[in-house]
C-alpha cells in the first residue's frame, strides 16, 4: 500500500496499490526463464529510474475497525494509473463528505499518446453503485467558453458542505509549465469557474475553509511563497494573508 485515506464516516478505506499492466519477458517467453532483456515497442516504458511494469490503482474497501473487506479496484481491468506517476500520491484522490463518492486524478491514455500529453482529468467514482464519470469534460464546455479542459487537472478536494469540488487545472495539453489555476465546480449544476484569475502565478497547495465559502492557498509571487484567500461568496475576491521574505510550504486548519 502506497497511500491511504479513511472515509469521513470511518467505515471505508481508500488506498493505492500497484497493479501489473505490462507483460514481462518471462510472461511473453516462458521457455526463456533466465532472460533479462526487455523488448520496447512503444512509450511509455520508463519513468526516471524505473521500468514501467505496473500502474498505481485506487482501491476502495469496507473497514470495520479491525480489517478491510469487499475490496474494489476503481480502475479494474484498465491500464491507466491513478495517482499519476512519477510524483502523484494520495493528494490526487479525495472522499466526498458523504463518503459515497471518490474523486480521482487520471490521464486515460497509453503509449505515445500518454507520453506526450498532459491531459489528465478529474473523475468521480460512485462507491455504492460502481462506475465513474469525467467531471472535467462532462458538459464539453466549461463556463469560460473553452472547448474542453485540455491540460493537467489534478488534486481534487470536496467542499465541507459537499456542494462543490475544487481542483488545480492547467489550460493547454502538452505544456507541463502552464499556469496552475484553481477550478471550482458546482456539483448540482456541473458549472465550472476559475476562481484564481486575480492571481497571476500558480495556485499550489490549497484548502477549503470550514464554511465552504472561501479557499486558502499558497502561491509564489516575486520569489516568495505566501498564503492567500479567495472569497467565493464575494466575486472571488483575492486577499493576501501573509507578508515577509519567507516561504510557506503547507496549509492546515485548526
Language model features by range: what are they?
Residues 8-9, 97-98, 160-161, 210-211, ...:
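Residue-level detector of Asp-centered blade-edge/turn motifs that repeat once per structural unit
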Amino acid at each position: 500500500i502506497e497511500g491511504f485515506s479513511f472515509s469521513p464516516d470511518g467505515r471505508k478505506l481508500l488506498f493505492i496499490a500497484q497493479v501489473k499492466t505490462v507483460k514481462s519477458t518471462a510472461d511473453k517467453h516462458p521457455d526463456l526463464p533466465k532472460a533479462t532483456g526487455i523488448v520496447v515497442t512503444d512509450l511509455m516504458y520508463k519513468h526516471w529510474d524505473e521500468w514501467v511494469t505496473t500502474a498505481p490503482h485506487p482501491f476502495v474497501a469496507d473497514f470495520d475497525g479491525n480489517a478491510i473487506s469487499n475490496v474494489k479496484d476503481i480502475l479494474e481491468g484498465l491500464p491507466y494509473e491513478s495517482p499519476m506517476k512519477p510524483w502523484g500520491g494520495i493528494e490526487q484522490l479525495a472522499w466526498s463528505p458523504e463518503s459515497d463518492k471518490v474523486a480521482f486524478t487520471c490521464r486515460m491514455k497509453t503509449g505515445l499518446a500518454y507520453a506526450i500529453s498532459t491531459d489528465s482529468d478529474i473523475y468521480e467514482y460512485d462507491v455504492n453503485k460502481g462506475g465513474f464519470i469525467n467531471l472535467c469534460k462532462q458538459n464539453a464546455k466549461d463556463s469560460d467558453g473553452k472547448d474542453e479542459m485540455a491540460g493537467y487537472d489534478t488534486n481534487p478536494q470536496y467542499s465541507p458542505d459537499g456542494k462543490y469540488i475544487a481542483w488545480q487545472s492547467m489550460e493547454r495539453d502538452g505544456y507541463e509549465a502552464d499556469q496552475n489555476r484553481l477550478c471550482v465546480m458546482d456539483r448540482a449544476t456541473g458549472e465550472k469557474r476559475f476562481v484564481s484569475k486575480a492571481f497571476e502565478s500558480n495556485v499550489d497547495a490549497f484548502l477549503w475553509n470550514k464554511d465552504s465559502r472561501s479557499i486558502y492557498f499558497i502561491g509564489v509571487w516575486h520569489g516568495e511563497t505566501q498564503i492567500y484567500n479567495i472569497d467565493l461568496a464575494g466575486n472571488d475576491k483575492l486577499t493576501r494573508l501573509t507578508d515577509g521574505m519567507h516561504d510557506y510550504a503547507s496549509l492546515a486548519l485548526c
